[in-house]
Amino acid sequence: MFIESFKVESPNVKYTENEINSVYDYETTEVVHENRNGTYQWVVKPKTVKYDFKTDTRVPKLGVMLVGWGGNNGSTLTAGVIANKEGISWATKDKVQQANYFGSLTQASSIRVGSYNGEEIYAPFKSLLPMVNPEDVVFGGWDISDMNLADAMARARVLDIDLQKQLRPYMENMIPLPGIYDPDFIAANQGSRANSVIKGTKKEQVDHIIKDMREFKEKNKVDKLVVLWTANTERYSNVIVGLNDTTENLLASVEKDESEISPSTLYAIACVLEGIPFINGSPQNTFVPGLIELAISKNCLIGGDDFKSGQTKMKSVLVDFLVGAGIKPTSIVSYNHLGNNDGMNLSAPQTFRSKEISKSNVVDDMVASNGILFEPGEHPDHVVVIKYVPYVADSKRAMDEYTSEIFMGGRNTIVLHNTCEDSLLAAPIILDLVLLAELSTRIQFKAEGEGKFHSFHPVATILSYLTKAPLVPPGTPVVNALSKQRAMLENILRACVGLAPENNMIMEYK
């Protein structure tokens, strides 16, 4: 059975006019290596930590500024939200299609809340806590091309032409602000698009972005702003002692107009200085050590890296299944070809390397979890190939071969062919990222013994379900297995309303 909404009734939960307060027992385990009668033993000790959660239920008017607004992802997301808001339908060769948010965790997925008369009860994911309605979001952003969003939508060749015709009046007056352009960080083939750029030194560019954000907030009367990078993949920045290794050195390098500070890092600096959440949707190392240090010192949310939409999402499920089933993956070969602007930019070796790193690390934690299958330091052979084929446009092809060792020296091979409509998969992920980033800024908590409430760590691991290479605080384990990432996100939000984590034991039926 599916219900649209619910309210938790518990002595541990209190609803007020502007808040939900919950007291939550977090049950975990501590592992110690102890000397017992002269012999060291591993001992696992269950423990319970009491947490207080406080969620502000006042939903703000949200502004979202996209870096690369005129790209395939930005134009597709904007078009999709408008189509939903206006209730637009359009004819395809198969049927009359209604606008929807399929592919969005927050808007189109469900959670289990319990059982009723022997039937499982589910509710929308977004019913857990008050979230911003996508149709109330004010979109804007920057681009190195001055093309309006209607023409950008047509150039992208993602949406059906009947839908594009209906959306054009809503989008033709949407024009991105000029963006920061540095040809050293992206492929040379992007130069033909760069007709709307912010001039000046890097310090002047940061100041320009800050001015743009302040004016956007004032013009649109938004309460909060989230900025997300959905522009070209950049090459990796060199992390150099004295250049970008500390906050002091990074800001000094901006002042000195050092060439190795990337455009994405400049946008992120501007956001952190303004206390505005910044999310990196591409694979480059935007968050150099000095920037992470700055975000932590300012308690400003940062998240990334790289949208997890197609091939990598499948990989984070399949390898988790194989290792969890006691099957040993020994070779993973991933081949992609695509024909959109992302593919053209990735045809340059230096930008492809950023994507290769992002895609290749996704199985590390799953391999490390099973010392029966893998010796220390052992790892499957893992190769990623990306080629540019203009004809296929946004319809990316992903082909994977997984070779594994099975019982008694046997071999198992799984081959997948995945046609990923690149921007149609990425757009709802962008939506989820900005909505969850905003929501997380309204949640505070404290553990038993802590005096004051505080927010989540500025490095937002809560967003890791949506990213290929999750950014985590220093010293924090990286989790890539998709099921674990979703469980973490859902269970944290459940804790905010006093619900137990979904453990799937269902003891009432045993």
Curated annotation (Swiss-Prot):
One protein family per Pfam: Inos-1-P_synth
Gene Ontology biological process: cellular response to phosphate starvation; defense response to bacterium; defense response to fungus; defense response to virus; embryo development ending in seed dormancy; inositol biosynthetic process; myo-inositol hexakisphosphate biosynthetic process; phospholipid biosynthetic process
EC numbers, comma separated: 5.5.1.4
Pathway given in the UniProt record: Polyol metabolism; myo-inositol biosynthesis; myo-inositol from D-glucose 6-phosphate: step 1/2
Keyword Cytoplasm in annotation: yes
Top-rank taxon: Eukaryota
Tissues expressed in: Expressed in siliques, leaves, roots, seed endosperm, but not in embryos. Highest expression in seeds. In leaves, only expressed in hydathodes and vascular tissue.
Gene3D superfamilies reported for this sequence: NAD(P)-binding Rossmann-like Domain (3.40.50.720)
Cofactor(s) the protein needs: NAD(+)
Subcellular location: Cytoplasm
Keyword Isomerase set for record: yes
Keywords, ordered alphabetically: Cytoplasm, Inositol biosynthesis, Isomerase, Lipid biosynthesis, Lipid metabolism, NAD, Phospholipid biosynthesis, Phospholipid metabolism
Gene Ontology terms, MF aspect: inositol-3-phosphate synthase activity
Chief location bin: cytoplasm
Disruption of the gene: reported phenotype: No spontaneous lesion formation and no significant alteration in the response to abscisic acid. Increased susceptibility to bacterial and fungal pathogens.
GO cellular component, one term: cytoplasm
Catalytic activity field: D-glucose 6-phosphate = 1D-myo-inositol 3-phosphate
Functional note: Key enzyme in myo-inositol biosynthesis pathway that catalyzes the conversion of glucose 6-phosphate to 1-myo-inositol 1-phosphate in a NAD-dependent manner.
Family, as annotated: Belongs to the myo-inositol 1-phosphate synthase family.
UniProt-recorded name of the protein: Inositol-3-phosphate synthase isozyme 2
Species of origin: Arabidopsis thaliana
Organismal lineage: Eukaryota, Viridiplantae, Streptophyta, Embryophyta, Tracheophyta
Gene giving rise to this polypeptide: IPS2
